[in-house]
Amino acid sequence: MKFFTALRRPHPRTILPLLAVLLLGGIGSFALDIQPFPREVLRTEKLHEWTFASGVAGFMAQHECALSATGSVLRIQSRGKDPYLASGSVNLAGPFMVQLRMKSATGGKGQFFWTTTTEPHTDEARSQHFNLIHDGQWHDYSVRLDARGTVTRLRLDPGSAPGLVEVEKMALVHEHLHPLELQSVHTVGRQISLTLTNHAETALACRVEDRALTLPAHTAQQVTFTAAGKAPFAAHTVQVLAGNLPPLRRTVFVADAGATGDWVMLRSPEATVRVARDGSGARLEIGGQLVGFVAPLVWRNGKLPQLKLVSEAGDLHFAGDGINLTLAQRGAELAVAIQGDGACEGPVLRALGALEQGLFAGVEYLGKNERSSSTLDIETEEHIRYAPDPLKVTMPLMAFSTDRALTALTWTNMTLQPIFATPDFLDGAEGHRAALRGRHIAATLLVRKPAPLEDAILWAVQQRGLPPVPPAPRSREAQMALSLKALMGPPLRTAEGWGHCAEAHWPRHPFADCASTIWRLTGEAPQLPHLAANGGHIRNESLYFVTGRAQQWLQERTAEVRGIIAGQKPDGSFHYTGKYQRGHFEDTASGYCAMHAIRLLDFARATGDRAALATGLKALDYMKRFRTPRGAQIWECALHTPDILASAHLVHAYVRGFELTGDRAYLDGARRWAITGVPFVYQWSCQPVMLYATTPVLGATNWRAPNWIGLPVQWCGYDYAYALAMLAPHDKTLDWHKLAEGILITAEQMQYPDGEFAGCVPDSFSLAEQQRNPWNINPCAIVSLRLVLEGQLDSLAVAAADGHRVVAPYPVTVRAGKAHIAAKAGVSYQVLIDGARIVPVTSRGNDELDLNAAP
């Protein structure tokens, strides 16, 4: 992942009014940092307006665009991936809203920047992203700018692709907000507590339910009351009245665990479901203990439908108010089918108990007692993600592991709007909330005894199966030729060597990974004055051994490992002290430790080094304490941030531990961490290139932008796929080879097929626009992954038997004290024996070395 300015992200405040309609609730008092609903707007006041009947109204093209005005419309001709234009001088106090009418036929997101009298330069921190619709039709947009101070100029970035954008009008509007704000609502049983804030300069008299109170200026007050009624489940609308001001209303949901109900029972050995005969909700029980609710089973517009139980012979069937609802229990699963004549929400799962882990696939991966929509990984308003664009959801799964149960929700129609909040800050009820919105909903709930989150992931995949692998974009021969083309010439290769990326500002070095890949593809070793380690995302060090540099390799790897050992703590951990520790509850993480463990164990595998093996295994044993894959991309993302690269490192490390020791506990660890990576992989598609794309992290670079949720970074995925290829021979829990192959094919689909960057892999890929985004990475790693999945050698071969260990650049086996190497007649190469002795070989094709012979 590399930062690139062409990204455009939406401003969440532009979608919150819609979400307020879609969702039916308030905000928990225990989560005051999350306010999903904006203050109500009383009226608007226009501050400034641009029209284009007489020209471009002072706007200036600044980068990769040209401006003209025709027929009272501003025409913006984008000529690249980063067009932007600036307004003339303005002198207005913020904050305010930009209202504009636009049509676009380009791609990407829109973004506004602003400058002020005290901050005269543009900066990502003083900007706001928003979604653009690129269908060539007129659309109205409202974008709130949280500008502080006096704004002097605006900059508009109208997307990130070439094409035409037109603006009919643009205005700056001040919003006059309701002085009162319902900041939170929380229910415990029938008791409702709300926090009411007065933002006005004077005290305000108001009434909440049957209570009259006066709120002093700029203060908040908590009001608690008991909802009337005795039913187990009810929707209650809280109303706040204040003189002539419009009333504030918020619908909350009451789930009363102590209430006596008229129940219809669904039973299995795994769970009992007590369903209210009026269809309002259900209790979930295991062994007589309440572990959660499905409450409501369905509702819309803040109201429970009047349902009638029309059949209870086997499955339960309810009908009424234009809704048909069916419940069917099969063991630990509860199937729910909802058919509505309009949009509704259901089933609403409310898992009870202390959170051990939570998952919203592609959006949230939570640890013990963590909150969803937190600012630990994203500090802009995009952290509010309880109802994301469904395109960001990688697979249909929301799950909670608590001290009472493992509960999960999966569905079939990926156009449904999933809702996820823990704790439930949306409609105020207890527990952890997962639900779906739409007209026709088919969902399955899982209710099991307490179990790890990985069990829910595995269950969801097994419900649907892994999807078919996408078709390859080209033949194998053409694929390898395309990758080779990128490596053989400019812009990636210069006289100094290769860049990790093709852009000119990436330093060029004689990278071993690049040179080794060329040798694998052509059989010819590039002539280089020296070798530099790395260069790709997957190490390929063959060239050291075919150019007489095995001793250099051994010295460099030994020094690397000795440095890692020196940095390991006595308990086996590795601690991080950089700026990206901010917000994390400790100074270590699973991915950060695993990246060091890999180096130790790979070296132990190649050389038999006892210190590397001992410290590597100590790291594996320490990492058993971790449950969330995170902290592997601390060059730009928080140590806390959930991360598929962490899953990749952990699988790699634990597979090596198992191979070196035969201890199946390490294989169990590899399997567990492999499962944690699955929710980062897209297992559905509505675009030509999408299936098996991989979300890299569930957070943002520098906590701000880019936000990587829903923005695939396939190189992180193919690192994970490479680790799965290592695991596949040892474990059949899932078809790891198929999963890895799907990720590889999608990476190859994303490769540039032609043009300046032909053969390079884009750093990220925008799904909606089907757009490749820089930087443009060398293809060494996907060559390695393809070779490995085909059962071929991609880098150095290691074989161990009969008390010996051999490293060679060709396939090698050890039998009866001899190394058997399948090389190529006439080539010269080196072999490392037992981590110490380097033997030169001139190949006869099938070479045999006596490992017990005197040096």
Q: Would you name each region that the model predicts?
A:
Residues 17-26:
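Bacterial N-terminal signal peptides
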Residues 32-64, 264-267, 473-478:
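Extracellular carbohydrate-recognition regions
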Residues 53-72, 303-308:
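Extracellular glycan-recognition surfaces and repeat-rich motifs
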Residues 73-150, 161-166, 173-176:
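Extracellular ligand-binding interfaces
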Residues 76, 113-129, 134, 173, ...:
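Carbohydrate-recognition beta-sandwich/jelly-roll modules
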Residues 184-189:
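Short, solvent-exposed loop/linker segments at the N-terminal edge
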Residues 453-826, 835:
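Glycan-recognition and catalytic cores of secretory/periplasmic carbohydrate-active enzymes
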